[in-house]
From Swiss-Prot:
InterPro entries: Poxvirus_VLTF3, VLTF-3_Zn_ribbon
Signal peptide location: none
Gene induction: Expressed in the late phase of the viral replicative cycle.
Renumbered zinc finger spans (C2H2-type): 166-190, 168-190
Record GO terms (molecular function): zinc ion binding
Species of provenance: African swine fever virus (isolate Tick/South Africa/Pretoriuskop Pr4/1996) (ASFV)
Family: Belongs to the asfivirus B385R family.
Keywords in alphabetical order: Late protein, Metal-binding, Zinc, Zinc-finger
Listed name of the protein: Zinc finger protein B385R
Cross-referenced Pfam families: A2L_zn_ribbon, Pox_VLTF3
One GO-annotated biological process of the protein: regulation of viral transcription
Domain of life: Viruses
């Protein structure tokens, strides 16, 4: 227990040091806000941990025999609540943010994807923080020019397209912007064109599909107004399994999709992993946060490349589970049979579509050094049942 408390205190000290060290630099405000989210999260986890063990600590003063029993119970709670993994998960995210910031500043860092020791991760985060400070100290001579601020009344100026520059709303002072092209066509939609509602975010698609592939989505997604918990759907599926004499332990993604089609509930195709877990009692492998973050990075890069190299004549929308399948097939070692079970929870499309996807993926891999291209083998996941 003392070891866990020491880990939480080490993380708290780390966050405080980073926040105080970077607060003086304007360019790190966004980074500090992102880290603040993880700081609040780890504080809440620490509070919850203390709430769980506090009743046992009170009982520990009742005698040596009971004290030993209480200590064993606390150790069991630490394992059940997966405390070390929760701390490690937060630190992996923090290190990822610090590495990302350093890479944008042009500083090369060593990736720590597979480190699962919280205290080592604290040390890694501290070293990354020191690199950020060292990078900033080397560039202190660089000054930020507030070009939007009026030099007479110090208020923010606004763009004036007719004067080709910035104009102060108070004194009317105009500051010409050299080398800037003003074109009114940028300020309204062209005829026949539709304005975009937002910026495309590949990370959002990745997290959505990973959540569903790993069966981490809410069980409420199986329900309806009449059946909030999805009990009726599961009962219907069990009847089909019994009718067809299927072995529950050998059910596959394709089996569930066919049964959902039979009961007219193809709207639940995204929830197949969750349904498999509910029916069989065995869920997808719980991939570590470091591997998931690495997968997210490669996925984002792959989608960016795809937008550049995709065939103009192709109308099919992106099928994101295919990309996730190819990424994890590439980054998970062949002997890691536990984690590679994730492949059997990903539905692959028909042969013609799969061939087109493989051809497109080959073009993506040419510009994606992290992945070596190979054709998709549908029978590959059979080895992991």
């Amino acid at each position: 227990m003392d070891e866990i408390i020491n880990k939480y205190q080490a993380v708290e000290k780390l966050f405080k040091e980073i926040q105080e060290g970077l607060a003086m630099y304007d360019q790190y405000k966004t980074l500090i806000n992102e880290l603040l989210h993880y700081n609040n999260h780890i504080k809440q986890e620490y509070f919850n941990f203390l709430m769980i063990i506090s009743p046992y600590l009170i009982r520990a003063h009742s005698g040596e025999t009971l004290r030993n029993k209480v200590n064993n119970e606390i150790k069991r709670l630490i394992l059940v609540e997966n405390i070390n993994t929760k701390i490690s998960k937060t630190l992996v995210s923090v290190n990822f943010l610090l590495q990302k910031k350093l890479s944008t500043d042009g500083v090369k860092t060593k990736n720590m994807w597979c480190t699962n020791n919280p205290m080592l991760q604290v040390k890694t985060a501290h070293n990354l923080f020191k690199q950020l400070c060292d990078t900033q100290s080397k560039t202190q001579w660089v000054q930020t020019l507030k070009y939007k601020e009026c030099k007479y009344c110090h208020t923010d100026m606004v763009f004036n397209t007719t004067q080709f520059g910035l104009q102060c709303p108070n004194c009317g002072c105009i500051q010409e912007l050299m080398g800037t092209i003003f074109d009114e066509t940028h300020f309204y939609n062209h005829d026949g064109q539709k304005a975009k509602s937002g910026i495309f975010n590949p990370n959002r698609h990745y997290r959505f599909w990973i959540e569903h592939i790993l069966g981490r989505n809410s069980e409420q997604e199986l329900g309806t107004k009449q059946d909030p918990c999805g009990t009726k759907v599961l009962q219907q599926l069990k009847k089909i399994i019994k009718r067809d004499n299927k072995c529950i332990a050998l059910l596959t993604v394709e089996n569930i999709r066919k049964m959902l089609k039979e009961i007219n509930r193809t709207d639940l195709n995204n929830c197949v992993s969750l349904i498999l877990r509910k029916l069989t009692g065995v869920g997808p492998p719980q991939i570590s946060e470091s591997i998931l973050l690495r997968g997210e990075y490669i996925f984002t890069e792959a989608i960016k490349i795809r937008e550049k190299v995709c065939k103009k004549g192709r109308i099919n929308r992106n099928y994101y589970p295919y990309y996730i399948y190819k990424i994890f097939d590439a980054i998970l070692p062949p002997n890691d049979t536990t984690n590679r079970r994730i492949l059997q929870y990903i539905h692959l499309q028909g042969n013609d579509t799969l061939a087109n996807n493989d051809s497109e993926w080959e073009s993506i891999c040419m510009e994606l050094p992290e992945i070596k291209w190979k054709p998709t083998d549908r029978t590959h996941c059979v080895h992991f049942f």
